[in-house]
Amino acid sequence: MSATIARAEEQQNGSTVELKDDTVIVVLGASGDLAKKKTFPALFGLFRNKFLPKGIKIVGYARTQMDHNEYLKRVRSYIKTPTKEIEEQLNSFCELCTYISGQYDQDDSFKNLAKHLEEIEKNQKEQNRVFYMALPPSVFITVSEQLKRNCYPKNGVARIIVEKPFGKDLQSSRDLQKALEPNWKEEEIFRIDHYLGKEMVKNILIMRFGNEFFNATWNRHHIDNVQITFKEPFGTEGRGGYFDEFGIIRDVMQNHLLQVLTLLAMERPISFSAEDIRDEKVRVLRAMDPIQPKDVIIGQYGRSLDGSKPAYKEDDTVPQDSRCPTFCALVAHIKNERWDGVPFIMKAGKALNEQKTEIRIQFKDVTSGIFKDIPRNELVIRVQPNESVYIKMNSKLPGLSMQTVVTELDLTYRRRFSDLKIPEAYESLILDALKGDHSNFVRDDELDASWRMFTPLLHYLDDNKEIIPMEYPYGSRGPSVLDDFTASYGYKFSDAAGYQWPLTHTTPNRL
């Protein structure tokens, strides 16, 4: 009953209204790294494909003093233009862009921004404003208060897009939410976790619930373990100051990987509405106990074996006595009928041997009969790079003898959908925010439940100074104990069939 009432209220206050006309996007932090690498390229991608509202204006706001021409020069430098056509489109895009400089904690600065917004909106019927906070968390609260006090539209819809991190633990997250509450309704807040905008992550619901053969085996009776892996081949590269404050668990696992886990584990929502989907995700989180230290290993990268790559603590921006983990593997457990007893293994690390994010679902062994020693089936979802889904399965090797070989059913997106462009995650999420669709954004109770899971572990690691991360070489797979750790939770790595994907050669596995 209450949920129905809430959704009715949302429709009345405009939170689910698609913004089609009379819209301004304000990018706060317009001269920063996030705006340069993600926000402006995404806005240009939407503009190129005609997904932005008609007559939209894009206002940049930052502390950096620069005139209009200097600002446009920066915007152009953010975006690649490999063809003449794209260069002409960028010229048109720049005509939508203006810039205002100001401080983040001064009324006069935001009054000046409000005056600029009113000037460019003077011929509009409504003042719909989307505020994109591409800002460090230290100024979130101050800026949100200033926006509400000075720049909130009198006649139109206001939305605020907030980037992670949403706090450092449960209490700081709650403090942040409490500070936002007086000024912004929950339905006006869009908390971005860009993994929810990735094509393969968005495909999880369709794949699970739109294919009965998956849905029927998606439980503890058929699945032995689930792995969610995030690997980066580079280190902090001069960003150690930021990273050392948060570490790999806060940076990747409490948000990106946990969001993927909830989509894998949730029950079928009753509809595709944002609230129904997020209700099911929250139910999964509430069925999970806090992560236990005994279910965790942490590491920190050292020099590469050839000495060409520096150790984490050799980064000038990192404290020499840092205990910050750059690698973590941990196991989460879901206490419900579907998943009780199935370990969810999450692994994330920097300075590893490759760039990869994937989901690996390993099915149970064939327990008896003539095939009892055959390799396990696996469903692998490659999130990035080279988006794909493949099923590792056993097949008879062509020939006169009864030999088996591990092969795969393979859906590689760039081959199957070669004529379609996979959108960038930020393009997808900004478009969702313009539409008022919260499905791929993080709700307040969802955020609370995720921090409840991780905060005890984070405090345990922070408070116990004697806990030192295991060192692993830059460019390796991670700490040397990793394989033993995953094996202790049931994961079976099998190279008996000489299996490779993509397939390059075949070695039979004789029965």
Swiss-Prot record:
The EC number(s) this enzyme carries: 1.1.1.49
Function comment: Catalyzes the rate-limiting step of the oxidative pentose-phosphate pathway, which represents a route for the dissimilation of carbohydrates besides glycolysis. The main function of this enzyme is to provide reducing power (NADPH) and pentose phosphates for fatty acid and nucleic acid synthesis.
One BP annotation, GO: pentose-phosphate shunt, oxidative branch
UniProt keywords, alphabetically: Carbohydrate metabolism, Glucose metabolism, NADP, Oxidoreductase
Keyword Disulfide bond listed: no
Residues holding D-glucose 6-phosphate: 164, 194-198, 232, 251, 350, 384
Family label: Belongs to the glucose-6-phosphate dehydrogenase family.
NCBIfam families listed in its UniProt record: zwf (TIGR00871)
Catalytic center residues: 256 (proton acceptor)
Binding site for NADP(+) 1: 29-36, 63, 164
GO MF annotations in UniProt: glucose-6-phosphate dehydrogenase activity; NADP binding
Gene: gsdA
Protein name in the entry: Glucose-6-phosphate 1-dehydrogenase
Tree of life domain: Eukaryota
PROSITE patterns, A to Z: G6P_DEHYDROGENASE
Pathway linked to the protein: Carbohydrate degradation; pentose phosphate pathway; D-ribulose 5-phosphate from D-glucose 6-phosphate (oxidative stage): step 1/3
